């Protein structure tokens, strides 16, 4: 973005006897970051101009001039030729001044019945609506990658963990589908947030509305808003829709951070469950052997960044009286960075999941080391009539003996198993295999391979 400086004059300078100092100008200017709203600002202005003509406030000639001038400005902005000026403070006054320079008095009439307060609120909602649509597409791409990988590994057994200790056998596909469900809820939250974002604040003016005979519903239709903000004070003063988005974004990043932690662990030699494609890793400047999972590590780190933006927005709003205050200028940078970080993370993640190489033998070996079928033995005893708490105690003693002798439960001979409970029969060995343990959980939401394949089919239908 290029900026220039012009003699001090502005949309409000007539009230003041001296120009704003240079340091205050730099301190208060938002153009270094709100220039990103330019295309949305032009969209809102064109709809506002069309409405002013519709209600008889703006002539057909002025409307045509505004449309032509805005078209030229849009081309300049997209081509990077627009000269942004700190003296014009923000994106709104920069565009208005440039428009007026092109078309004369018609440009000065554009702001009739409008304030920068409702103008910026409209711009942010247009920006965020577009961002949510892109993020929803990114979530869908990530979910698709998860489903594809889960389908390929519906039968691949791995240890399920609690407290990062081997707990029970699950399939890798089942594990991946847990993240599919988390992202599905994230998508629901984003879509629900979009409904509240998609309300038109324009027409609220500074805070009390306007004396011009405006038609807010007309502008809403022009811009694709589902409804109009019903209270002018609320329309310009609150940013709860941005906070809600930031909260939903923080949850998405939290879910991806958890998956990132697992990818990092699984890629480590101590686990060796997976490998990531080289394009998502880096090396060491001193240790030639290193292949570091930088992308998932950065996802973990950037999650803290997004969480921080949520807190910043909450803190920004908590002490403001109605209506608009300059504090709200500080909403844009955390919002923009949250959108950028989340959109980039989703795009990278969808591709990274497609590049995961799974190592089933390592997963199988790991699940054999932690008595993962102990719960199956307890369930077996319960089905034989033993109360669960007694069954739990029996199996715990059997695990201790097996552990001390370096054996698995399935390696204990029947006569030794019967010393712990005489009701154990030789049919128990079918349940103490990994395959038997998985197959036993053949219900909706369970980890049996048949259920995982059915869940994959349902997931594809939801995408």
Swiss-Prot record:
Entry annotated with the keyword ATP-binding: no
Lineage: superkingdom: Bacteria
Sorted UniProt keywords: Amino-acid biosynthesis, Arginine biosynthesis, Cytoplasm, Lyase
GO function term, MF aspect, one: argininosuccinate lyase activity
InterPro entries in alphabetical order: Arg_succ_lyase_C, Argininosuccinate_lyase, Fumarase/histidase_N, Fumarate_lyase_CS, Fumarate_lyase_fam, Fumarate_lyase_N, L-Aspartase-like
Localization: Cytoplasm
Top class in the EC scheme: lyase
Chemical reaction(s) catalysed: 2-(N(omega)-L-arginino)succinate = fumarate + L-arginine
Pathway: Amino-acid biosynthesis; L-arginine biosynthesis; L-arginine from L-ornithine and carbamoyl phosphate: step 3/3
Signal peptide coordinates: none
Cystine residue pairs: none
UniProt cross-references to Pfam families, sorted A to Z: ASL_C2, Lyase_1
BP GO annotations: arginine biosynthetic process via ornithine; L-arginine biosynthetic process
EC numbers: 4.3.2.1
GO CC annotations on file: cytosol
NCBIfam families referenced in this protein's UniProt entry, alphabetically: argH
UniProt cross-references to PANTHER family, sorted A to Z: ARGININOSUCCINATE LYASE
HAMAP family xrefs: Arg_succ_lyase
Record-stated family: Belongs to the lyase 1 family. Argininosuccinate lyase subfamily.
Protein name: Argininosuccinate lyase
């Amino acid at each position: 973005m290029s900026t220039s400086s012009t003699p001090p004059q502005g949309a409000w300078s007539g009230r003041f006897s001296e120009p704003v100092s240079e340091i205050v100008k730099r301190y208060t200017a938002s153009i270094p970051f709100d220039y990103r709203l330019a295309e949305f600002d032009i969209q809102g202005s064109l709809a506002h101009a069309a409405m002013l003509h519709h209600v008889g406030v703006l002539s057909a000639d002025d409307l045509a001039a505004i449309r032509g001038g805005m078209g030229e400005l849009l081309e300049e902005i997209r081509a990077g030729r627009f000269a942004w000026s700190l003296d014009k403070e923000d994106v709104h006054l920069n565009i208005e001044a440039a428009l007026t320079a092109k078309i004369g008095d018609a440009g000065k009439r554009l702001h009739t019945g409008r304030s920068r307060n409702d103008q910026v609120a409209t711009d942010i909602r247009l920006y965020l609506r577009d961002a949510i649509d892109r993020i929803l597409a990114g979530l869908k791409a990530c979910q698709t990658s998860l489903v594809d990988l889960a389908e390929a590994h519906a039968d691949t057994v791995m240890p399920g963990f609690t407290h990062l200790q081997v707990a029970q056998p699950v399939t890798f596909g089942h594990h991946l589908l847990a993240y599919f469900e988390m992202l599905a809820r994230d998508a629901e939250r984003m879509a629900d947030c979009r409904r509240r974002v998609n309300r038109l604040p324009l027409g609220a003016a500074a805070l009390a509305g306007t004396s011009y005979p405006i038609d807010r519903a007309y502008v809403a239709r022009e811009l694709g808003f589902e409804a109009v903000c019903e209270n002018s004070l609320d329309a310009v003063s609150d940013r709860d829709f941005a906070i809600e988005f930031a909260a939903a974004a923080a949850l998405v990043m939290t879910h991806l951070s958890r998956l990132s932690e697992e990818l990092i662990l699984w890629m480590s030699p101590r686990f060796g469950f997976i490998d990531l494609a080289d394009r998502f890793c880096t090396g060491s400047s001193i240790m030639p052997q290193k292949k570091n999972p930088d992308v998932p590590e950065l996802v973990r780190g950037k999650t803290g960044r997004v969480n921080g933006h949520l807190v910043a927005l909450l803190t920004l709003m908590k002490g403001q009286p109605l209506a608009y205050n300059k504090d709200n200028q500080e909403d844009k940078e955390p919002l923009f960075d949250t959108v950028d970080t989340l959109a980039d993370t989703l795009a990278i993640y969808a591709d990274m999941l497609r590049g995961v190489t799974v190592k089933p033998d390592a997963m199988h070996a790991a699940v054999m080391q932690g008595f993962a079928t102990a719960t199956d033995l307890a369930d077996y005893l319960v089905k034989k009539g033993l109360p669960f708490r007694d069954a739990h105690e029996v199996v715990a003693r059997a695990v201790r003996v097996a552990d001390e002798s370096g054996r698995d439960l399935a390696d204990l001979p029947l006569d030794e198993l019967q010393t712990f409970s005489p009701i154990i029969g030789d049919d128990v060995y079918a349940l103490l295999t990994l395959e038997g343990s998985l197959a036993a959980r053949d219900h909706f939401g369970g980890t049996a391979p048949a259920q995982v394949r059915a869940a994959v089919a349902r997931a594809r239908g939801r995408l």
